[in-house]
Every structure is written in structure tokens, then in C-alpha cells.
Amino acid sequence: MATATLPATVGVIGLWDGTTDGKEGFMDYATGDTNVKQPKEYEIEVHDIRKLDPQPTLLNNGYELVDIPTVVTEEQFSESGKSEKGKAYIKDVYFAECKRIIQEVAGGVDTIIPVSFRMREQKGEKESTTKKLGNIESRYAPRPVAHLDRDTPTAITVLEETVGKEKAQELLSKHKRNPATMWPLCFLNHDRIPTWNYDTHVGHVWSLNDPRVSDRGEKTYDCVVKYDERYDYHYVSDLKPEECLVFCSFDSIPKYAMPHSAFWDNNVPADAPNRRSIEVRSLVFF
């Protein structure tokens, strides 16, 4: 008997809940010291992108569902974390595939610079995953808290690390984006919040002794998204291996910057397999 696809589901997402002392948030990864409260959980209705009309697009909304058939096998993805040869293969083959899909959906792209590749896998159930958010071992786990990968200062930092300060200054004169190709996710659409920007809707968690620098480059703080009742929540049901979501995890025009998060879907069976995802981040200039 066929099962109907629901246009929406209900789930839980974590959002910024401030600090214990009212000051800027910090996390010391060496000692575990922090003043950041655990993310506050909100029950949300999440609408299926497949059922939306019109469909969201990268150029209009900052995110888009696309097909990206790949020649890379699951074994080759796994090997990327085990050997330099495996890592080099991903950079040579998969990065080229991701660049091509960004060119197709973005249009008018001047420069695309892939900067990172990561595989994430959930280890354990909801409670343990949430509790481990600040732990070193959670660095490759899904992030069940709404966030942005970068804002303007931290995007400039990774650009300078990648191409050098002189080349960075040349590129900074152009419109810049940080698209990621990733699955599975919940997007926080803020089309109904015309004043949305990094200053009003993002809390900072300053990092000390951060082990993630080797994976993602220097980032002085993480950007955790604040609650706003005007958000619309979107996801993709039954995402297939040949599909992915291209979105702007940072954009120099805040309208296109897309807050995102793993979320806990109440309709997922208790014995469902752990959440897994593959992501590539690129710096894109127009």
C-alpha cells in the first residue's frame, strides 16, 4: 500500500537562548567552559519544498533543490577521511561536480573556490546529540541548532586564509556568497522578515582553543540564529542520493543568507537509521 507524502511535518529545532551572564557567548574547547545556554527548543511546522509553488531558488531565496548525479561512490567518499589519496580524489572530482552545479543554478558567476568538504553522521539519539553540541567529538555530527556558517567578518577571514590578503581585497569588490551543497536540512526562510540581518537575528559564540580550525579554517565566533515568529521552515522529503540542496550559508546581501539546521522530525520512526550528510562549501563571487 502506497504511503502519501505529507506537505508538512512537525519537529523540533534549537535556537539561540542567550548566555548565563548576559555577556557575549564563549566556548573554550580545551576546558569545556562556556557561558552559553543550551539552545532553546521550539516545536515547528516544516513545509516540504517539493510541494511549494513556486519552488524556492538560489537567486530569489538563497536555496534550491537540484539534481547532482555523481561518479563518486560511497566507498570513495569514506576513503576521503582516511588517506591523502582519497582526499585528493574528492578535491579533483567531487569539487568539479559541485562547481558545475553552482554555475548552473547561480548564473553570472565570476569565481568559484571550493574550500571544504565534510561528511557528517549522527551518533546516538536526540538527547545525547543535543548535549554534545559543545564537545570536540560532535564536530562531525549534525548540528540540530539553527545557525549560519559565516557572517561578513568571518567570511573575510576564510577568504584571506584561502587566497591571501592581496587577492582577497581584489575579490571583495565583488558580490560574494558562500554556497554549500548539503543534505538533509531545515531552512529558516526569512522572506517575511524584511529587516533580517546579521546584527539583529544572530548571536555569537566566541571560540577558544577550537579544534575545528583544521577542518574549516579560522573563525573567531559561531553564528547561532535567534528566534523570530515570522520564519517559515522548509525541508525536502525523501531526499535521494542524486539530489542535493544548494544554499547560501553566507551572502554579502543578507536577504540571501540562509539560516539552517538539522531538525528532529516527530514523524520519523524510532528505528530510523542515523542522519548522514555530505557537504562542500565554496566561496563564490559575481
From Swiss-Prot:
Functional summary from the UniProt entry: Oxidoreductase; part of the gene cluster that mediates the biosynthesis of squalestatin S1 (SQS1, also known as zaragozic acid A), a heavily oxidized fungal polyketide that offers potent cholesterol lowering activity by targeting squalene synthase (SS). SQS1 is composed of a 2,8-dioxobicyclic[3.2.1]octane-3,4,5-tricarboxyclic acid core that is connected to two lipophilic polyketide arms.
Protein family: Belongs to the asaB hydroxylase/desaturase family.
Top class in the EC scheme: oxidoreductase
This protein's name: Oxidoreductase clz15
GO molecular function, one term: oxidoreductase activity
Key words of the record: Oxidoreductase
Transmembrane segments: none
EC identifiers of the protein: 1.-.-.-
Pathway involvement of the protein, from the record: Secondary metabolite biosynthesis
